[in-house]
């Protein structure tokens, strides 16, 4: 029997329903059936409604796209244990304490979570590119539990001030491909925007290596702001940025410390999902 697929409007309407809505059950039942029949290797996370809804919402309840995303998620985790097998925060605590990463206190006007990464606080002699990417994966696994984030996705700001050749050497073609996989179709979060600021000339070689692995949709959502970025950034993120980037209410140090505390409080959960797929 031909399977009915919701059109864009229906999918977006389903996206706004609460987890307990009976209207979500047909999609949940079908996605669960596909996973069980395919015998896909399981992650440590059981096939609860909440877990399956991440994939359905990430693809606006298009079952075929959600199923493809889920298969890619399992495949990526199995093939990249150096990234996904150990999500315990103590492995990257030095990066967090250095102030490499923070999450803004408020969402943007579209409801997206906004994440900030500062390359100057990554010492490539101490932490590898895999360590750095694990920071992003840890945050992603935490915020993907939020229903509003499932609906409205994330936007990332990368401050590339301090980017050096030693950083570039860490981003091999293999690493670039793995990073691109998560940005495109291997993790159940909608990437709504990527904003690069203070990008030096030597960064463009690395960007050129990653770009071929990205979808056209993701490419269209990448914004290069350069060194004179404050006015353009404030247009994208009015009233929610830290002082270092044109805001007024709080500093990067504040939000880095707050997010580090939140990650450490989530250590038990992160440990529980850190086992490698069997």
UniProtKB/Swiss-Prot annotation:
Q: Where does it live in the cell? A: Cytoplasm
Which keywords does this Swiss-Prot/TrEMBL entry list? Answer: Cytoplasm, Lipid-binding, Transport
Any single GO CC term annotated in Swiss-Prot or TrEMBL for this entry: cytoplasm
Mainly resides where? Answer: cytoplasm
**Entry-linked CDD domains:** SEC14
Q: Where does a 1,2-diacyl-sn-glycero-3-phospho-(1D-myo-inositol-3,4-bisphosphate) bind?
A: 185, 190-192, 217, 221
Residues annotated as binding (+)-alpha-tocopherol: 187
Detail which positions bind a 1,2-diacyl-sn-glycero-3-phospho-(1D-myo-inositol-4,5-bisphosphate).
208-211
For this chain's UniProt record, which GO biological process terms are given? embryonic placenta development; intermembrane lipid transfer; negative regulation of establishment of blood-brain barrier; placenta development; positive regulation of amyloid-beta clearance; response to toxic substance; vitamin E metabolic process; vitamin transport
* UniProt GO MF annotations: lipid transfer activity; phosphatidylinositol-3,4-bisphosphate binding; phosphatidylinositol-4,5-bisphosphate binding; vitamin E binding
Is Cytoplasm there in the keyword field? yes
Effect the entry attributes to changing residue 221 to W: Loss of tocopherol secretion (in vivo). No effect on tocopherol binding and intermembrane transfer (in vitro)
> Could you confirm whether the keyword Transport appears in this record?
yes
Question: Which residues are in the CRAL-TRIO domain?
Answer: 88-253
- Record InterPro entries: CRAL-TRIO_dom, CRAL-TRIO_dom_sf, CRAL/TRIO_N_dom, CRAL/TRIO_N_dom_sf
Job of this protein: Binds (+)-alpha-tocopherol, enhances its transfer between separate membranes, and stimulates its release from liver cells. Binds both phosphatidylinositol 3,4-bisphosphate and phosphatidylinositol 4,5-bisphosphate; the resulting conformation change is important for the release of the bound alpha-tocopherol.
Kindly state the subunit structure of this protein: Monomer and homotetramer. Phosphatidylinositol 4,5-bisphosphate binding induces the formation of homotetramers. Phosphatidylinositol 3,4-bisphosphate is less efficient in inducing tetramerization.
Family matches, as PANTHER family: ALPHA-TOCOPHEROL TRANSFER PROTEIN, ALPHA-TOCOPHEROL TRANSFER PROTEIN-RELATED
This one is known as Alpha-tocopherol transfer protein
What is the species of this protein? Answer: Mus musculus (Mouse)
């Amino acid at each position: 029997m031909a399977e009915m697929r919701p059109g864009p409007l229906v999918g977006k309407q389903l996206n706004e329903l609460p987890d307990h809505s009976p209207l979500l059950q047909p999609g949940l039942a079908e996605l669960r059936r596909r996973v069980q029949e395919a015998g896909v290797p399981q992650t440590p996370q059981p096939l609860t409604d909440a877990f399956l809804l991440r994939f359905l919402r990430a693809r606006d309840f298009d079952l075929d796209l959600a199923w493809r995303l889920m298969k890619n998620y399992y495949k990526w985790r199995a093939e990249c244990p150096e990234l996904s097998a150990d999500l315990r925060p103590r492995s990257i605590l030095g990066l967090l304490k250095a102030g490499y990463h923070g999450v803004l206190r408020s969402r943007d006007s579209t409801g997206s979570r906004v994440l900030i990464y500062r390359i100057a606080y990554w010492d490539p002699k101490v932490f590898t590119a895999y360590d750095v990417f694990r920071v992003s994966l840890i945050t992603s696994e935490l915020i993907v539990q939020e229903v509003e984030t499932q609906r409205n996705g994330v936007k990332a700001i990368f401050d590339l001030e301090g980017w050096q050749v030693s950083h570039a050497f860490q981003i091999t073609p293999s690493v670039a491909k793995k990073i691109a996989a998560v940005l495109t179709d291997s993790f159940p979060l909608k990437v709504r925007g990527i904003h690069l600021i203070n990008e030096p000339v030597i960064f463009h070689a690395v960007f050129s290596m990653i770009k071929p692995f990205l979808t056209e949709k993701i490419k269209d959502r990448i914004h290069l702001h350069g060194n004179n970025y404050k006015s353009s950034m404030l247009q994208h993120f009015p009233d929610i940025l830290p002082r270092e980037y044109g805001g007024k209410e709080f500093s990067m140090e504040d939000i880095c410390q707050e997010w580090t505390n939140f990650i450490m409080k989530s250590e038990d959960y992160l440990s529980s999902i850190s086992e490698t797929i069997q």
